[in-house]
Amino acid sequence: MRHFLPSLYTEAEPADIVMETAKGTYIGKFDRSNYDNSKPAEQQPIWSIKLVATPNDHTIQTLYPNGIKNPIFVWDQKESYQYKFALS
């Protein structure tokens, strides 16, 4: 299995996600409940992100009460994932 964000990812727990924005830092976790270990990482469904803390601003919780859906994944030439977030 190719590792997703090796510095943040572990086999046992979802990856912690840190988003730096103008309004503060948002902490989230991947929901990996639909992860299929029989498939390579690039064939996995898009994972949702559940926000678990918004220390500086609560606007994002109001706009996205169930977390941010459908982050945009980029498969780069080094076969590692990078990610971008669509907040609008």
Briefly describe each language-model feature range:
Residues 1-88:
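Viral virion structural and adsorption modules
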